[in-house]
Regions:
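A short linear hydrophobic-aromatic micro-motif
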Residues: 52-56, 213-214
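Charged, glycine/proline-rich intrinsically disordered loops and linkers
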Residues: 7-29, 178-193
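C-terminal beta-strand edge segments of enzyme domains
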Residues: 173-295
Length: 295
């Protein structure tokens, strides 16, 4: 079981401390360690199906306190290898009661046999510099998982497709009011909106010219399919390539930090130090002198 989007953060006031703590504790218990048993199963599923998988999870910060969460997207290749993860850089409004700020070192593009894959999460896609950091690394297949579902969001997906000359998949979950209240009836006072749907989904796929080629898929669970033509990506960059001939690095520069940020730094003088490896959460003895410890 992988918990999805915590919709209740938009309904329950922050002052309802007892209820918020209970729900957060449950979400933390269900959260995913990366790598861990859950990602191992996802990797096995990708290998069995022979597909690339891009999936959102609530990630626990196991390399530090273990008590905080990130809104994270995981990418797995068809051989079952965990290529990487991206943590949402800035939680949106009420999301900050749940998720920590993501580490920018997780902002990356992965070169695969089917193209260069990467993406941003929800309202990160309104961050021009974040988008450009992907364009500048040659992204071709752009994932945009979201909880947004309105007409403006579909226009955003189309804009990204044309701006970056990429294929972009805007995937949004569908959620009925009964999906929440059937399990958490105590939340009914906070869910007084009329209608069956909390989120209608409206997932779409757009091409490098900003045309919607699949979807929108609304008020139902399902799968969108679209054919990807690599030549269409390169051909459309003939007249617009924002990280190529349409760039002006002499006028504008973007600096992206790729080194992970340590939670704490401990100075141990000349005795060497022990640090936490961010990727596998193991402790490594460093034989160094006059160094600092990064955890």
């Amino acid at each position: 079981f992988i918990p999805a989007y915590p919709d209740w953060i938009w309904h329950i006031p922050a002052g309802q401390i007892t209820l918020n703590q209970k729900l957060y504790g449950e979400l933390l218990d269900q959260a995913v360690s990366i790598p861990g048993a859950t990602t191992d199963r996802l990797c096995q599923a990708a290998r069995d199906a022979g597909v690339y998988v891009s999936i959102g999870v609530n990630e626990r910060n196991d390399n530090a306190s273990g008590g905080s969460l990130f809104n994270t997207n995981v990418l797995i290749d068809r051989e079952g290898n965990l290529l990487g993860r991206h943590q949402k850089l800035v939680p949106t409004v009420s999301e900050r009661m749940i998720w920590a700020y993501g580490d920018p070192s997780t902002l990356d593009v992965y070169d695969t046999e089917i193209g260069k894959i990467g993406g941003l999460i929800c309202h990160e896609n309104y961050m021009p510099l974040a988008r450009y950091s992907l364009y500048g690394r040659g992204i071709e297949l752009y994932t945009a998982p979201t909880y947004d579902q309105g007409g403006t969001w579909q226009s955003t997906i189309r804009h990204i497709g044309k701006e970056g000359r990429v294929y972009v998949a805007g995937c949004c979950m569908v959620l009925r009011k009964d999906d929440v209240l059937s399990r958490y009836p105590q939340m009914e006072p906070y869910y007084q909106e009329t209608g069956e749907w909390i989120n209608t989904g409206n997932s779409v796929i757009a091409d490098p010219e900003g045309h919607i080629i699949a979807g929108p898929l609304s008020m139902e669970e399902g799968i969108l399919y679209a054919d990807v033509n690599p030549e269409h990506i390169s051909n459309t960059r003939w007249n617009l390539d924002v990280a190529g001939h349409y760039a002006r690095p002499d006028a504008f520069q973007l600096k992206v930090r790729t080194a992970p940020t340590p939670v704490i730094t401990i100075d141990r003088g000349d005795s060497g130090f022990v640090s936490t490896d961010v990727e596998d959460n193991t402790f490594i003895q460093k034989d160094t002198v006059d160094e600092t410890e990064s955890v």
